[in-house]
């Protein structure tokens, strides 16, 4: 190991050795003279930034008090923030059982919440089923601290991942796994497809988890990033795991957990505010709170509390949906113009497009991604999302940018994709 002589633990050395090649490549890349790139690879929403800044500036100016300079005043985080989160979730996620403040633990972002959850759920080397394709960040998130293992679940046709055909694929992956399985992680809305799971599929997944005695983990960070899309007239609406009558379908509520943050739906990933919601598992709630109760910034808590309780919140969500739709149309009009295949989306700031339709190998895909980078646009190649072998050439494109930047990104992409 490259880090063997550095005095690190085996766990630390393993993490460093795994990530160091990527860090070296990134540092080398920064030394190259190049046109500043437009980032379409990171799933961030830039469409509400001015409104969020205006609102939170006022909140910090008027709402920051002397006690905010102390540690959070509640076991699971800032009391006002937790109260605001509970009211917000009850209003917009329509839970079957109302969410109480003592169901919630906060942490710096949903990824930290999930990391803490996995640390408390899994012994090192135990697995979590994750339907593919999935967010490439799960690869490091699972392993870096918790030493858990994402166990990929592939449906024969990737397009069927959000259908009832997922259930037999889950059964197969569970039975064939060489390591103990502790849970199923479902990202809903799905990343990178930007669509929602039907309620019936979610209920079947919860039943599957109940039958195996494992946990159902619902990552809902794009819950309110939905918009109208005529390409998907019959698309299922977003349904939170909280909305399902878990006991009513004969399952154990103590094994159902939900995660959300302000990062995606409110374009504020820099605030680092996330929460876990577990309604019938006091031990897990305490474990989650213990690990993160002093980690969230009071400034972020003040700003996020103001955002979640603002009288303007319904207006902001409506504005977000409108702007997402407009930004989506701008990107898809470009894709249609060049006959680039894409998967229609209606619940995310990104879409999945086949930017390298002639790709026969992963190297072919990588080459087109590199050409786009040279043209000044970063996109996220499909291989990183663990797509099926027959899906070479795809990439995730974030479209939720200001119009001027989106238009410039399209102009640059056209120099590459317009020649294929």
From Swiss-Prot:
GO terms for molecular function: pyridoxal phosphate binding; transaminase activity. Its cofactor is pyridoxal 5'-phosphate. Its EC number is 2.6.1.-. InterPro entries: Aminotransferase_I/II_large, Ethylene_sulfur-biosynth, PyrdxlP-dep_Trfase, PyrdxlP-dep_Trfase_major, PyrdxlP-dep_Trfase_small. The modification N6-(pyridoxal phosphate)lysine is found at residue 264. The keyword Membrane does not apply. It comes from the Eukaryota. GO terms for biological process: amino acid metabolic process; biosynthetic process. Keywords: Aminotransferase, Pyridoxal phosphate, Transferase. Pfam families: Aminotran_1_2. CDD domains: AAT_like. Pathway: Mycotoxin biosynthesis. Belongs to the class-I pyridoxal-phosphate-dependent aminotransferase family. Probable aminotransferase; part of the gene cluster that mediates the biosynthesis of aspirochlorine (or antibiotic A30641), an unusual halogenated spiro compound with distinctive antifungal properties due to selective inhibition of protein biosynthesis, and which is also active against bacteria, viruses, and murine tumor cells. The non-ribosomal peptide synthetase (NRPS) aclP is responsible the formation of the diketopiperazine (DKP) core from the condensation of 2 phenylalanine residues. PANTHER family: AMINOTRANSFERASE GLII-RELATED, BIFUNCTIONAL ASPARTATE AMINOTRANSFERASE AND GLUTAMATE/ASPARTATE-PREPHENATE AMINOTRANSFERASE-RELATED. This is Probable aminotransferase aclI. It comes from Aspergillus oryzae (strain ATCC 42149 / RIB 40) (Yellow koji mold). The lineage of its organism: Eukaryota, Fungi, Dikarya, Ascomycota, Pezizomycotina. The gene is aclI.
